[in-house]
From Swiss-Prot:
This is Uridine kinase. It catalyses: uridine + ATP = UMP + ADP + H(+); cytidine + ATP = CMP + ADP + H(+). Its main location: cytoplasm. Belongs to the uridine kinase family. HAMAP family: Uridine_kinase. GO terms for molecular function: ATP binding; cytidine kinase activity; uridine kinase activity. The keyword ATP-binding applies. GO terms for biological process: CTP salvage; UMP salvage. GO terms for cellular component: cytoplasm.
Amino acid sequence: MGKKPVVIGVAGGSGSGKTSVARAIYEHFGDRSILVLEQDFYYKDQSHLPFEERLRTNYDHPLAFDNDLLIEHIHKLLRYEPIEKPVYDYKLHTRSDKVIHVEPKDVIILEGILVLEDERLRNLMDIKVYVDTDADIRIIRRLLRDINERGRTLESVIEQYVSVVRPMHNQFVEPTKRYADIIIPEGGHNHVAIDLMVTKIRTILEQKSFL
């Protein structure tokens, strides 16, 4: 039986610091052996829908994600085959025509708010992580990200948080904490937790004869 990459799932609420955790792990191993696969890139294609209908998309609901494609891509990466990762256009609220070529690596970090929600995804993971951060900090980070990076207005972000993000977090995201092997408070700023994770990843890599 050939070697298979290590898959790490990093979940947590929007603005919890998942990306910081993924980046901190990435920096320990470097580009040669690790890749980050963001669930955000795998929102469903909505090009068949009128723009007004796309505006009503609930991006925090499990059904917003094309997990079938994501799982297909993970299986390819586990076979050391490259993938063409989709790109999502947040201004048009649908999948872009562009794709990103991704080469397989020894460590795959799967990062997203609901990566622990789908049992099929969980079954592909060697380590399951939940990043736990105060709601106040999460909403501030989401405000800054959506306004600066996604062209949103302050009013629209606040309205979406109150009507969609917070209830979806409580209903779908927070409950996935029970599936986590590791719960990390404070995200990427928790250096002790990051170091412990890096040590665990190295152990798994050694067991799989990568190191």
